[in-house]
Amino acid sequence: MTNIRKSHPLIKIINHSFIDLPAPSNISAWWNFGSLLGVCLMLQIITGLFLAMHYTADTTTAFSSVTHICRDVNYGWLIRYLHANGASMFFIFLYLHIGRGIYYGSFTFMETWNIGVLLLFAVMATAFMGYVLPWGQMSFWGATVITNLLSAIPYIGPNLVEWIWGGFSVDKATLTRFFAFHFILPFIITAMVMIHLLFLHETGSNNPSGLNSDSDKIPFHPYYTIKDILGLLFMVLTLMTLVLFSPDLLGDPDNYTPANPLNTPPHIKPEWYFLFAYAILRSIPNKLGGVLALVFSILILMLFPLLQMSKQRSMSFRPLSQCLLWVLVANLIILTWIGGQPVEHPFIMIGQLASVIYFSIILIFMPIISLMENKLLKW
């Protein structure tokens, strides 16, 4: 009699994906983030579901319903802060996961990489709409500013914005539809994650050397399940420390003031994980130019497979490319810092400089350095 794990139609799929999956023997802790992202997604869906049971998507009661969750619902404060800080963890892992993909050349799996970029867009859209739901000052003004960017689209822009708003300003209709989309998108993301994994399992995982590892595979379970559990423990420790000791560390105090269309906050800014893109948006004086730069700052990831000039896949043995990648990381940290600063001298200049450097590194310097390294190795 064959093992049910290998014969049952459904369990067989799980077996091939998480148990008997042949994995490279040398993948490092950088390969943990995929599973951590999966755990984050499940955590967000579960906590979000419980929050939705008590939340009301109406401009008059949204803010007070969130207050009610925190004060009156059993462990409501815990669920709410797990959800809010879980989003921050999600983005930390996303950025590390993408960074790993760039460093080790995982973007050569074109289908996996491109669906990953689409996943990033979907997660960003979900997070943005979720930030609007508590209906605080930053929720309202963030929604107004970001949706208003669409008015930069020639000809259809203004009509498009009013269509998204469901009226002539961000109001009840906007909040209701944002709640609907915020609820449905994580399930669409889950489906996209399955496609992401499907494409990945077509080729198998990459590894730190960037070489073909077909001759040296080990089963995913128990070797990498136990390794993923260690990563999970670190994640739980970090998240619970954040939630239980300083739950508002990454939030904005302005969001504890109910939304008021008649009073604009002095500094409108999104959550920390969008600040780098927000800085790029603000660094261009032209509205349409800024919007294009904002979209392209993420869309540029899709160009990585086309800009790969090196004969080696991974950066493990390419010190010049490594240096350049770390300059890019430092530049992104600077952009994140600038995005949270007021629009005044010297921050405007620093933001513009950092934006130019960001695009230059990816589009110009990385391919040139790769070609130089090929020459150094007489390739």
Swiss-Prot record:
GO CC annotations on file: mitochondrial inner membrane; respiratory chain complex III
Name of the protein described by the UniProt record: Cytochrome b
Protein residues bound to heme b b562: H83, H182
TM helices/strands, residue ranges: 33-53, 77-98, 113-133, 178-198, 226-246, 288-308, 320-340, 347-367
More info: Heme 1 (or BL or b562) is low-potential and absorbs at about 562 nm, and heme 2 (or BH or b566) is high-potential and absorbs at about 566 nm.
Binding-site residues for heme b b566, renumbered to this chain: H97, H196
Family as reported in the entry's similarity comment: Belongs to the cytochrome b family.
Principal cellular location given in the protein's record: mitochondrion
Membrane association type: Multi-pass membrane protein
Function: Component of the ubiquinol-cytochrome c reductase complex (complex III or cytochrome b-c1 complex) that is part of the mitochondrial respiratory chain. The b-c1 complex mediates electron transfer from ubiquinol to cytochrome c. Contributes to the generation of a proton gradient across the mitochondrial membrane that is then used for ATP synthesis.
